[in-house]
Amino acid sequence: MILNDRKIRELIESKELLIDPLDAVQIQPSSVDLRLGNDFLIYPEDIEILDVRNPDLHNQLKKVVADDEGFIIQPKQFILATTREYIKLPDYLTAFVEGRSSLGRLGLFIENAGWVDAGFEGNITLEFYNANSRPLKIYPGMRICQLVFAKMEEPAENPYRGKYQGQRGTTASRIFLDKD
């Protein structure tokens, strides 16, 4: 069941669902608008191969902190970004992230794993790709995506406690921690 605005507000007021910071205008009829944080990770062009088994790969990324002047994503550039909001989902609630159509119409693809598991806690790292042939300027604090919540029939037996639990800010891939 997708949660409506009334139920989202109830869960926030009861502190079962945490979204911080949150302004009441971010709550939409069936979602919550999330805003862009101000730190970005960029893959330098001198990295020849992104080796998923390289535990040092994340240290090779360039961190950029944007101010009110904004951040420019070059054509065909891939970067990592984050939401300003820190979220904490209860064990019976899952969510998925949807990019804003208005940004998609400018060529900005906003991706992530798409699904936020029950029990997750942290900022949400977003993957951006500028598919346009022109640079695109974005600004910290702007609405960047929507979080849609779904209540599960029962709480998760094993809620999320994975490698991204508690992440703060833009977080690089931790695939090297996978056991398979």
Curated annotation (Swiss-Prot):
A GO biological-process term: dUMP biosynthetic process
Residues given in the record as dCTP binding sites: 100-105, 117, 125-127, 146, 160, 167
Active site: 127
Keywords: Hydrolase, Nucleotide metabolism, Nucleotide-binding
Molecular functions per Gene Ontology: dCTP deaminase (dUMP-forming) activity; dCTP deaminase activity; nucleotide binding
Family membership noted in the UniProt record: Belongs to the dCTP deaminase family.
Protein task: Bifunctional enzyme that catalyzes both the deamination of dCTP to dUTP and the hydrolysis of dUTP to dUMP without releasing the toxic dUTP intermediate.
SUBUNIT field: Homotrimer.
Full protein name: dCTP deaminase, dUMP-forming
Organism, scientific name: Persephonella marina (strain DSM 14350 / EX-H1)
